[in-house]
């Protein structure tokens, strides 16, 4: 089939490649414009644009597709059979959604209707969901409200972070989208209700669970509150990897990997941290207090309940440090305090 592909980050690249390798014709790729990054503020293309150029594909970079009528016309002239959208980053207007005869299909990173919107992967970890998944959804004007054609579940491990989980989900999204293509093609053209009936899509209103929305994360969301529980701090560090931040001696410190020293989670934690579980009494120190630097592992810090082990971090102006290198870099003495943002 002739496919118009919409996507921007690394997450979308496997789907673009898989559709091409499956023999479909990618008539065009729509992605976000180049953005300035790094200290030199150099213009950098999106991951999808970089891959599309290597593949010799035609690329479109509208700043706002809703308002760019010229780009809309150019895309219509490509006459795609359908559009495939994976993490594009803009809401498509109704006329764009209605243009392809076989519809617009989105690869979404959650088990809808849970976690509609931006950042479903991060929110599934933040909220402690035991599993997530990916689905192929028929797009409509509402935010991720369309019916689901097919989906797959994926467990979330205690030590999964936003990056590792996204990598697994991006591969699964690509597999699922390739699987969906012959189903969509076999349903043929016709009105949207007719095609959906032939496809036997699942309306979200008929599915279990209430709808929830993965709102955009704020600067404050990334700041560590040491008065939270060890498990909630751990979830924040893992979900927002590599951007959860605290203060150490008035400098910003990114926390890259932590492990909550909680007995009921023992089986999910590495064996080398098991001797640390239960070593310190709960509530014996103010939250954010350094309890001990443990050789080869990292720094143990108090929380509102059980302590947490900080195993990897990045101090402002420095590179990543783990275990002993982290201990050396922080030079943390017992009873020292991590800071909080006012």
UniProtKB/Swiss-Prot annotation:
(6S)-5,6,7,8-tetrahydrofolate binds at residues 110-113. It catalyses: L-methionyl-tRNA(fMet) + (6R)-10-formyltetrahydrofolate = N-formyl-L-methionyl-tRNA(fMet) + (6S)-5,6,7,8-tetrahydrofolate + H(+). The keyword Transferase applies. Gene3D superfamilies: 3.40.50.12230. InterPro entries: Fmt (IPR005794), Formyl_trans_C (IPR005793), Formyl_transf_N (IPR002376), Formyl_transf_N_sf (IPR036477), Formyl_transferase-like_C_sf (IPR011034), Met-tRNA-FMT_C (IPR044135), Met-tRNA-FMT_N (IPR041711). GO terms for cellular component: cytosol. One of its GO terms (molecular function) is methionyl-tRNA formyltransferase activity. The keyword Protein biosynthesis applies. Coiled coil: none annotated. Transmembrane segments: none annotated. Keywords: Protein biosynthesis, Transferase. Belongs to the Fmt family. Attaches a formyl group to the free amino group of methionyl-tRNA(fMet). The formyl group appears to play a dual role in the initiator identity of N-formylmethionyl-tRNA by promoting its recognition by IF2 and preventing the misappropriation of this tRNA by the elongation apparatus. This is Methionyl-tRNA formyltransferase. It comes from Synechococcus sp. (strain CC9311).
């Amino acid at each position: 089939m002739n496919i118009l592909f919409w996507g921007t980050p690394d997450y979308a690249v496997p789907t673009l490649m898989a559709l091409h390798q499956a023999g479909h014709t990618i008539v065009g790729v729509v992605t976000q414009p180049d953005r300035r990054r790094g200290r030199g503020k150099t213009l950098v293309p999106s991951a999808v644009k970089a891959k599309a150029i290597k593949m010799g594909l035609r690329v479109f970079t509208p700043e706002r597709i809703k308002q760019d009528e010229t780009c809309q016309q150019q895309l219509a002239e490509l006459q795609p059979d359908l559009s495939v959208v994976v993490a594009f980053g803009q809401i498509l207007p109704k006329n764009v959604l209605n243009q392809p005869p076989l519809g617009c299909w989105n690869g979404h990173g959650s088990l809808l209707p849970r976690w509609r919107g931006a950042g479903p992967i991060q929110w599934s970890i933040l909220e402690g969901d035991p599993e997530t998944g990916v689905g192929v959804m028929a797009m409509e004007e509402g935010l991720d409200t369309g019916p689901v054609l097919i989906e797959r579940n994926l467990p979330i491990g205690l030590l999964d972070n936003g990056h590792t989980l996204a990598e697994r989900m991006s591969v699964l999204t690509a597999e699922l989208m390739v699987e969906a293509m012959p189903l969509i093609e076999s349903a043929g053209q016709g009105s949207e209700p007719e095609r959906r009936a032939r496809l036997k899509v699942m309306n979200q209103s008929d599915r279990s669970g209430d709808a929830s929305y993965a709102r955009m994360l704020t600067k404050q969301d990334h700041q560590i509150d040491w008065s939270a529980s060890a498990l909630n701090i751990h979830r924040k560090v893992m979900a927002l990897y590599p951007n959860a931040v605290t203060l150490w001696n008035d400098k910003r410190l990114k926390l890259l990997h932590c492990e909550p020293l909680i007995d009921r989670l023992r089986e999910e934690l590495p064996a080398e941290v098991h001797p640390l579980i239960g070593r310190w009494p709960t509530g014996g120190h103010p939250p954010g207090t350094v309890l001990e630097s443990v050789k080869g592992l990292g720094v143990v810090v108090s929380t509102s309940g059980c302590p947490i082990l900080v195993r990897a971090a990045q101090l402002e102006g420095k590179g990543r440090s783990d275990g002993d290198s982290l201990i050396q870099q922080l030079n943390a003495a017992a009873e020292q305090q991590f800071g909080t943002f006012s």
